[in-house]
Each structure stands twice: as C-alpha cells, then as structure tokens.
C-alpha cells in the first residue's frame, strides 16, 4: 500500500513542473490533477506599514494557443512588466484580465489582520489570500483554467507582482498490449449493487474546565468508514469567545453548520449567546486534503495535506492532524471550539467543546432548529462578524462597552442635576409662601374716652371714639414717605371740684360722678382723612343733655 502511494506521488509530481524563469513561474499540470501553487508574496510589511492590499487576477489563454506561449522579457499589459509572458504572433489575445480575489489588511503590532475580502471561484480554481501566504488551490485541473495568474501586492502605494503561467495538458495514453484469450462461455451471475456509503463518527467531550497555564489535548476521537476510491476533505477548527458573555445558556445551532450562509445564521437573535454560522467565528486551523485514497482511520495523517489558518501560539496540531494540543493555556483562551469535517465539499461530521476556567463555565446546548432572525441585522451581505483571537485584547468590544457606559453615566448625571434644580426651586417657593403675610394697617393710637365712665344703665352719655382713620383709609406700601399724624389734643385745664346742686349726698344707685361739659365744646381732633359721607348732627342732643344735668 505504501509503495502504491509513493508511486502515485511520484507520478503526480512528475506531471507538475515549476520553472522559475526571470521571476515567472511556469506550472504544467495534467488534466484532472490537483495542485497547490504558491504565489510568492513579494513584499514584506515593515514597522511603518499601515495598509496592505492583495489581489489575484487571471488572463485566459485563447483556445489553440497553448503551444505558442513563451516566457520573454516583454510587457503584454500594464500590470505585467519586467518579467512577463508573451503570446505568439499566430494567436490573438481576445480576452481581458479580470480579478478573481481581493483582500485588504491592516497592520497591527507588526502583523497583518484581514479587514475585508471577496472571492470569485468556479469550482476548480480557489484563490487564497492569507496574512502570511497567497496560494492557488487547483481541484481537478481542466484546459479551461490555463492562462496567466498574477498576484498583486500593494503596501502603502508600492506595487509588486508575481506571475504564474499555468498550462494543462492531457495525460498520455499508454498502449495496452493485445492478448488473445479464449472467452469462456457466459455465466449468469446475479448482480449485487455495490454500496458506496461513507460515514464519520466523532466522540468528544462537550466541556472541559482548565486552570491558567495548564497543558492538555483536545481530542474528538474521529472514526472514518470510507468506501470511495478517492476523495477530498477538509478539517476545520473554529473558535468563539464566551468569556464576556453573560448568558445563562449558550446554544449551538446544528442547522447553521450545514447552511452557514443563511440569513438567520448570519444575523441571529441574541448573537452573543449562540454559535450559528462558522462565518461569524474565527478559523484557527484549516487543513486541506486533495485526491486522497486511504480508507483507514489514519487517513488524516497518511494523505498529503496543506495546513492553512492563523493558529495561536499556545495551540499546536496533534500527531494525528485532527486533534489540538494546548500548551501553557492562558485564561483568555476561554471559548467554544467547534470541529467541522468536510467530505467532498459537504459537512459530514462536527462537534464542539467548551474550554473555560472555573469562573467562566456555562451551560451549552445543541439546538437542531433554525435560529430566529434578529430585529436589527445588517443588510450588507459583505459584512462579516469575526470573533477576535483569544490571545488578542478585544479593543473593539472594550471601546463599545466604554462608550455605552459613559453615555449611561451622562444620562444619570443629567437626570440627577435636573431633579436637584427642581427640588431647590420648589423649596424656595415653599419658603417664600410660608414667610409671606398680608399687609396689616396698624393704628398707632389707643382707645380714649371722651367722657367720664358711669355705672348707671340709664346713663348713655359714655361715648367711645377711636382716633384712627376710617375703614376706607388705605396705605400705599410702595410709598417711601412716612404718614404724618396730627399731635394729640392738649389736656383741658383742671376744673375745681364739683358740688351737688342740692347739697345732699349722692343719690343711691349712681356712681357719684357728674359729667361737666364746657360751654364751648372741645374741638375734636381733625381726622386724617375726611369721610366721604357726612354723619348726623348731635349738637341739639348735647345741648338738651346739658340743660337736664344742670
């Protein structure tokens, strides 16, 4: 078996010839062959590099001109100079050069990080533009893919090219010797249908709790049952960070593993609490197998493969090329690790394992339904949500969290300030209302008597008079002038002691006082304000009282 595999490898490499003539690679493949062509990245980013752009372009060879192509020091287009390819005089170049892949990178800490990319594939040629390598992956070569493939690399405006001339030829037919054999009589044998069924089974643990700095192996225990003579396969490992998730339950949707480009898988509801499409995760390991014919369980390590992907410094592929080895694992490696096996381009087996420290352990559940589409999702299909590597600080998430926190804090401060101002204003209003009193007009004079009091009920001579203004008087509170009151009347001269007219004692039932009136009545004080209506005249009544008392 090993001899057969070695002979096939020799035949394969014998059919593929790579010549480096003046910087141009000339690759010759046989029809139906599989190959991986290195694009030879011609520029290396420096410490001052800020932006890198890579692109693959294709210039198709016209039909019938495969034998009239040579490598010469001639330019055929503006993008191909210095070391170029020329087509003979008898062939007309009717097709134009068109792009098949484009990728943009940013430089972070001296290493490239992909920001956006786009690919145009036809099922046979798969251009790959990675951070460290740029290759062309050929599956079952056909004459239609023959032509000029150019890798363009632009670093801060400086452009370089790497050219590959690919030709595809039909394999030579080996003459078979004619053997004369007597044909036996036909024997009727019942035809039994041949079962061509391939099956893959994985037996892995769905969770593992580790300590910071621990080393261990993450195994999926892959079992394979392959009946096809040759096949192609891919082994992929994806990572999704769960350390910053506050979900009680993390869901893994199996439907999205088989349909990664569905809209509900690209933009699910509660995307931080679910693993849906692998496109939303970070690919940490990608191994490609082409034209493999080993049918045992050890086919991943026996068949020829190409390792792609940007794996982390603490992760190494295991000896069987399927499992992962973790060495001195940091706490930032917490997350969901998903294994996917593609057989002839279709997912056939998958499993997941939650690696976390004790502080970030959570429940993970496999969901076989379709996830719900998020209410606010991106309509731009070119946008990709990429989970950052666990070894790199997620500055974007930290910045978003800081902006949300500052906005929330600003709203709280503004609300508290508004409430404080409202309380101060309301307190001032209550204080002013409580201290405010209606204006009172005070009489500066006391009540005086204009006659001598008596205890005789029949004597109604006692008259009270308040030396004050009328009820109609009003004061202007806004006036700064003080009110001037007339001086009080001078006291009357002292009268001699009176005597009873009849010379006897005071009659019983009386107070013993007599009221003496002057001949000239005492003038009343001039009121401050004259009443509008003149009161009744009591002068006659007073004269009668005087005559009676005499």
From Swiss-Prot:
Broad class of the protein's primary localization: virion
Assembly and binders: Interacts with gI.
Keywords: Disulfide bond, Glycoprotein, Host cell junction, Host cell membrane, Host endosome, Host Golgi apparatus, Host membrane, Membrane, Signal, Transmembrane, Transmembrane helix, Viral envelope protein, Virion
Keyword Transmembrane: yes
InterPro entries with a match to the protein in the record: Herpes_glycopE_Fc, Ig-like_dom_sf, Ig-like_fold
All ranges on the Intravirion side of the membrane: 426-550
Glycosylation site positions: 47, 109, 122, 241, 291
Family recorded in the similarity comment: Belongs to the alphaherpesvirinae glycoprotein E family.
Organism: Equine herpesvirus 1 (strain Ab4p)
Protein's cellular compartments: Virion membrane; Host cell membrane; Host cell junction; Host Golgi apparatus membrane
Membrane topology, Virion surface segments: 24-408
Main function: In epithelial cells, the heterodimer gE/gI is required for the cell-to-cell spread of the virus, by sorting nascent virions to cell junctions. Once the virus reaches the cell junctions, virus particles can spread to adjacent cells extremely rapidly through interactions with cellular receptors that accumulate at these junctions. Implicated in basolateral spread in polarized cells. In neuronal cells, gE/gI is essential for the anterograde spread of the infection throughout the host nervous system.
Biased composition (Acidic residues): 471-484
Name of the protein in question: Envelope glycoprotein E
Residues in the signal sequence: 1-23
Top-level taxon of the source organism: Viruses
Pfam families, sorted: Herpes_gE
Ranges that cross the membrane: 409-425
Free-text description of this protein's post-translational modifications in UniProt: Phosphorylated on serines within the acidic cluster. Phosphorylation determines whether endocytosed viral gE traffics to the trans-Golgi network or recycles to the cell membrane.
Acidic, as annotated region: 468-482
């Amino acid at each position: 078996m090993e001899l057969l595999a070695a002979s096939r490898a020799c035949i394969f490499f014998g059919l593929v010839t790579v010549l480096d003539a003046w910087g141009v690679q000339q690759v010759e493949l046989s029809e139906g062959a599989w190959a991986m062509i290195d694009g030879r990245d011609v520029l290396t980013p420096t410490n001052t590099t800020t932006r890198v752009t890579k692109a693959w372009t294709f210039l198709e060879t016209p039909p019938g001109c495969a034998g009239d192509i040579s490598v010469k020091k001639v330019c055929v287009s503006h993008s191909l100079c210095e070391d170029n390819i020329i087509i003979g005089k008898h062939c007309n170049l009717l097709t134009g050069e068109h792009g098949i892949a484009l990728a943009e990178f940013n430089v972070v800490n001296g290493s490239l990080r992909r920001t956006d990319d786009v690919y145009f594939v036809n099922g046979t040629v798969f251009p790959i533009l990675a951070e460290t390598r740029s290759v062309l992956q050929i599956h079952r070569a056909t004459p239609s893919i023959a032509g000029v493939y150019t890798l363009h690399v632009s670093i801060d405006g400086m452009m370089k090219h790497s050219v590959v001339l690919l030709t595809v030829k039909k394999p030579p037919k080996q003459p078979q010797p004619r053997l004369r054999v007597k044909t036996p009589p036909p024997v009727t044998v019942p035809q039994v249908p041949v079962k061509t069924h391939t099956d893959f089974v994985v037996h892995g643990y769905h969770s593992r709790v580790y300590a910071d700095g621990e080393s261990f192996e993450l195994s999926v225990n892959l079992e394979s049952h392959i009946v096809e003579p040759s096949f192609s396969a891919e082994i992929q490992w994806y990572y999704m960070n769960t350390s910053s998730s506050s979900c009680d339950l993390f869901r893994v949707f199996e439907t999205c593993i088989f349909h990664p480009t569905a809209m509900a898988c690209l933009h699910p509801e509660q995307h931080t609490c679910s693993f849906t499409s692998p496109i939303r995760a970070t690919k940490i390991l990608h191994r490609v197998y082409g034209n493999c014919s080993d049918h045992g369980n050890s086919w991943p390590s026996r068949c020829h493969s190409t390792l792609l992907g940007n794996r982390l410094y603490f992760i190494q592929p295991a000896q069987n090329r399927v499992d992962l080895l973790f060495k001195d694992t940091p706490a930032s490696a917490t997350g969901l690790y998903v294994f996917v096996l593609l057989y002839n381009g279709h997912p056939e087996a998958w499993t997941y394992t939650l690696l976390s420290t004790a502080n970030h352990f959570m429940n993970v559940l496999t969901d076989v339904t379709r996830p719900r589409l998020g209410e606010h999702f991106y309509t731009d299909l070119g946008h990709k949500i990429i989970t950052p590597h666990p070894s790199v600080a997620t500055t974007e998430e930290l910045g978003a969290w800081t902006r949300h926190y500052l906005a929330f804090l600003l709203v709280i401060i503004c609300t508290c300030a508004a409430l404080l101002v409202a309380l101060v204003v309301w307190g001032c209003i209550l204080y002013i209302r409580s201290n405010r009193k209606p204006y009172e007009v005070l009489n500066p004079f006391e009540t005086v008597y204009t006659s001598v009091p008596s205890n005789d009920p029949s004597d109604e001579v006692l008259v009270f008079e308040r030396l004050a203004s009328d009820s109609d008087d009003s004061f202007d509170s806004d006036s700064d002038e003080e009110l001037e009151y007339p001086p009080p009347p001078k006291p009357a001269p002292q009268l001699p002691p009176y005597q009873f007219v009849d010379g006897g004692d005071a009659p019983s039932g009386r107070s013993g006082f007599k009221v003496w009136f002057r001949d000239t009545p005492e003038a009343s004080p001039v009121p401050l304000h004259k009443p509008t209506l003149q009161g009744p005249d009591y002068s006659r009544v007073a004269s009668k009282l005087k005559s009676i008392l005499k």
